[in-house]
Amino acid sequence: MDDKQHTSSSDDERAEIATSNQDQETNSSKRVHLKRWQFISILIGTTLITAVITVVAYIFINQKISGLNKTDQANLNKIENVYKILNSDYYKKQDSDKLSKAAIDGMVKELKDPYSEYLTKEQTKSFNEGVSGDFVGIGAEMQKKNDQIMVTSPMKGSPAERAGIRPKDVITKVNGKSIKGKALDEVVKDVRGKENTEVTLTVQRGSEEKDVKIKREKIHVKSVDYKKKGKVGVITINKFQNDTSGELKDAVLKAHKDGLKKIVLDLRNNPGGLLDEAVKMANIFIDKGKTVVKLEKGKDTEAIQTSNDSLKEAKDMDISILVNEGSASASEVFTGALKDYNKAKVYGSKTFGKGVVQTTREFKDGSLLKYTEMKWLTPDGHYIHGKGIKPDVTIDTPKYQSLNVIPNTKTFKVGDDDKNIKTIKIGLSALGYKVDNESTQFDQALENQVKAFQQANKLEVTGEFNKETNNKFTELLVEKANKHDDVLDKLINILK
């Protein structure tokens, strides 16, 4: 084995202090957290990187590799013998790599732990890209909309921008091959590749279609965004990756330069990431020598403390942290520390509640094992696993911003009884249509509103909630979410 790391993160296209399964948990039913790009990402598949944000935590418990006892050795010998027998004597030829992976997967599955998993070499690569925030590609954010792959925006200074790619460009081919019917992640995989190699995109812009050659480069995706909203500085932290602490420090300094005294740290739908980054970020606001998080394994505990003086420009700032049920892991470590030291007031809704830390061990073949090794507590000793952190002031998320994705493989009509019908009603109500109940029944009144929706959006008027209606419904909810961040607006009004 090569590196041993402790992770506190989530997963591919997700991650946090624990594992790459965090998003799968918070979105087990594909729950939509309507927070700007996050909402788009979940609802219509916007993706810039397929990131497994893992956490490199602290190795604090000195472990000695001891010899196996007789029982363990016997079990290991048995596994080895079964592998050899099946690999050599089974009547059909077996793939030795698949047998090995199946054995490992079986052991991990037996843990019944959603945060422990074995990653292949390819999965490990994605996982590490999530940790670093770096990947090789063209730097264009894409989304799937109405069965088309569309560029949302090229990153500033990226190869895509330099090549002339524009927002709303529709990609029809990659390297001369049609992408019709392909999933968004498949297209992203095709667009990516080795550094300094070229990819040719066939782009449709209006009635014009042309080929654009773009050289792939290493792209860094920033995890922090700063905006000035009146007299309040809003710093959005999307994940905890390499140098998120540096990005946060820069954002705080910009806010100070702008003369702002009130800062909102927006951690909504932040699944976590690197634990050491969470500690460094807390150190911006918490003085030297203070405990940020306590790690515990059995009877062994260690307090991880700040190592530097806090940022002087942040000392007089009024800090507010905005969280929701999608804020997990490293987000909770950071929030818990600032809350315990009264350095920030917490707003929003209760956080996810992930209080365990994973360790990663990477093997020589590039694969990786991630497993839960310890739990963590806040400085005051609060164990938030399964409980979350309650905000000091609750700001409820509008119902339409927490909808489950409606599968577009099914059509709903009068007489149907389905949980997705409640989602349809909530969404239509948010879009201004008259809905008098939120039951799971598709009644005549709902049919009338669906017809009105279809007519207003120039769709075939059937009264049935079909694929085309669903796509437009989703698109309009996304637009509404992007135009109106109700929760953030409420918080800014509170802070005025």
Swiss-Prot record:
One of its GO terms (cellular component) is outer membrane-bounded periplasmic space. GO terms for molecular function: endopeptidase activity; serine-type peptidase activity. It is found in: Cell membrane. Residues 1-16 have a biased composition (Basic and acidic residues). The chain crosses the membrane at residues 39-59. Keywords: Cell membrane, Hydrolase, Membrane, Protease, Serine protease, Transmembrane, Transmembrane helix. Its EC number is 3.4.21.-. The active site is at S329 (charge relay system), D340 (charge relay system), K354 (charge relay system). It comes from the Bacteria. Residues 1-27 are annotated as: Disordered. This is Probable CtpA-like serine protease. It comes from Staphylococcus aureus (strain N315).
